Amino acid sequence: MAEQPSRQQILQTQYNSYKSRLQQIAQKIVDLETDADEHKLVMDTLNSMDNNRRCFRMIHGVLVERTVGTVVPILKTTQEGIQTAMNGLLDQYKQLEAEFQKFQKDNKIQVVRQ
């Protein structure tokens, strides 16, 4: 007959799960911040150029020729989408962090570091 996991093992598994999910969300936020910074850099560069000037944009691995005037609105929309996603992930992170802290408090978990 298989032995049931102890309460300590269950709590350790839940603790590790919370930590892992928090790290995953934090990594996604960092990735989106990097994308947002890159979009801002491109937007700053393109805003100082003539709208009829040719530029190239990578779409799913294909380099497509466009004009600055057609690319800037698309980049602006993408940048807003990135910001919305970041805000959603930040809210999700804060909610999960509060849930994690409640879990620690309810189960009287103290982190011991060596």
UniProtKB/Swiss-Prot annotation:
Cellular compartments per GO CC: cytoplasm; prefoldin complex
Is Hydrolase set as a keyword in this record? no
Q: Which GO terms describe its biological process?
A: protein folding
Keywords, A to Z, come to:
Chaperone
Domain of life, source organism: Eukaryota
What Pfam families would the database entry show? Answer: Prefoldin_2
Recorded hits in InterPro entries, A to Z, give: PFD2, PFD_beta-like, Prefoldin
Q: Which GO terms describe its molecular function?
A: protein folding chaperone; unfolded protein binding
For this protein, the parts annotated as crossing the membrane are: none
PANTHER family under this entry? PREFOLDIN SUBUNIT 2
Q: What does this protein do?
A: Binds specifically to cytosolic chaperonin (c-CPN) and transfers target proteins to it. Binds to nascent polypeptide chain and promotes folding in an environment in which there are many competing pathways for nonnative proteins.
**Family according to the record:** Belongs to the prefoldin subunit beta family.
Assembly behavior: Heterohexamer of two PFD-alpha type and four PFD-beta type subunits.
What name does UniProt use for this protein?
A: Probable prefoldin subunit 2
Q: Which organism is it from?
A: Schizosaccharomyces pombe (strain 972 / ATCC 24843) (Fission yeast)
